[in-house]
């Protein structure tokens, strides 16, 4: 407050290490914020829009995104999106829309190691012989590939519509109990 720390405490335990040890959280503990950005940026923006009466928490999504009118997604409320009670799946593998299926043989991802395969995470092995679709990914920036996607990889802004089309057609469960979903915040950003 006014340049002074007024509360500096730490609680809980960190995730177990590979050796299985759990360490107490300290005030100097570091965290990976990779996935929290969506919530940390979107939630305050939504709070501001609600305070300005530009968004109503209990309004269905179709109020703000008419393209959701024809699906169950249109009936999901802003409140349900914020509380992860939308019925949306945890995520969608959008990367599959970026990869040219004809550029590799066999499966893209397998559950067992195979000759030439690259270990991804856990028991997942990837086929490194794939190519990205040129419509969406390029090795050099250009008028059509303006967004930095990775090291020497540039994404076309046109991919956003592919992402939104997949999102708008996602299956919405009638079970509205808590289930974390990255998709909620992607929708709220729209």
Model-assigned labels for residue ranges:
Residues 8-10:
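Residue-level detector of high-confidence beta-strand sites
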Residues 1-6:
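Short, glycine-anchored, charge-dense loop/turn motifs used at functional sites
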Residues 12-180:
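Active-site-proximal loop and beta-strand segments within enzyme catalytic domains
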């Amino acid at each position: 407050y006014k340049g002074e720390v007024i509360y500096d405490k730490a609680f809980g335990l960190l995730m177990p290490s590979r050796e299985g040890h759990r360490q107490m959280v300290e005030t100097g503990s570091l965290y990976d914020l990779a996935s929290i950005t969506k919530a940390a940026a979107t939630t305050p923006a939504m709070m501001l829009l609600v305070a300005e009466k530009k968004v109503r928490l209990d309004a269905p999504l179709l109020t703000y995104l008419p393209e959701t009118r024809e699906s169950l997604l249109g009936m999901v409320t802003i409140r349900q999106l914020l509380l992860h009670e939308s019925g949306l799946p945890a995520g969608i593998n959008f990367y599959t829309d970026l990869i040219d299926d004809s550029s590799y043989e066999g499966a893209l991802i397998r559950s067992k190691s195979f000759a030439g395969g690259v270990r991804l995470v856990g028991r997942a092995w990837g086929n490194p012989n794939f190519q990205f679709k040129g419509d969406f990914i390029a090795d050099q920036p250009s008028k059509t590939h303006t967004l930095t996607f990775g090291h020497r990889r540039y994404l076309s802004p046109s991919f956003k519509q592919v992402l939104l089309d997949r999102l708008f057609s996602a299956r919405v469960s009638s079970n509205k109990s808590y289930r974390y979903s990255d998709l909620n915040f992607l929708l709220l950003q729209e």
